Amino acid sequence: MTIKISICTSVKIFNNNLCLLILPLLFVLTGFNSLLQAQDRNYEDVIIMGVYAHPDDETSSGPVFAKYARKGAQIVLVVATDGRLGVTDLTDLEAGDELAELRREEMQCAADVLGADLHHMRYHDQLRAPEGQDLFIQESRKIIDELHEIMGEWQPNVIITWGPDGGSNHLDHRIISATVTQVVLSKDWEQRPSLFYSGTQIPDLGELWKYRGVHEDFLTVRESFSEEDVDVAAEAARCHSSQFGPDLIDSWAEQWRHRGHFYFRPFEAPRAKADDLLNYPSQYE
């Protein structure tokens, strides 16, 4: 009865019989009921969408996608570019159509391993920015149009993408982060999805913290996963053999197993309306 007494005392309910009647309501109000419901959730009704720039970017959250696929959720991966500029020492291919075709095959392989549906757009890396600003803007708007259609078709419950840092400050990553945010902000949703940005805590980045780090106060979602999920994610990453060598993937898998979780920053919906910037309630109070 210790729990009952401590709860009742905290709300100044000293009659034991009355406390027993009110306790169920207290559990609802304090979120215990929600937690119990979450344990019994039917994940088959859940759609989780990852939106990325390149084939292989999904590896950044691979264990998370593997986790929810294992639970029965539908995973949808959306990849904007064909990866034609992803030249490495792992193949003899130069930038261009042949490399793009190989990377499309690799991306399909990874999606199959993760148990995900795949929408692979065919935009050029950098959205043809080297060819001029006007063409870049045209390509950027085409992606927005296409994402509106894809997201409207799937109506995802959750969307995961890069944060404004792009993970590695990559131009394409940052463009996709901004593009996904724009679609979520502008679309008239039947049910607005929860948007999450991948993030890395500052202590994990050393001297790179200023360019890629996210303060822990913003990384409020700590998503855990199992060793089984790591195994699936590593197998999916091995599909991208033109980009990652086996030793690198093994090192990632070891890090994932040791850490056991990833951090995400939620895109927070407005909490109030105001007619003055200084009158808007601070989210940090």
Where are these regions (language model features)?
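N-terminal secretory signal peptides that target proteins for export/translocation
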Residues: 1-15
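Short intrinsically disordered, low-complexity coil segments enriched in acidic
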Residues: 2-3, 26-29, 271-274
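Bacterial N-terminal signal peptides
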Residues: 19-31
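Active-site beta-strand->loop->alpha-helix modules in alpha/beta enzyme cores, enriched
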Residues: 35-190, 283
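The feature marks non-catalytic terminal segments
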Residues: 187-285
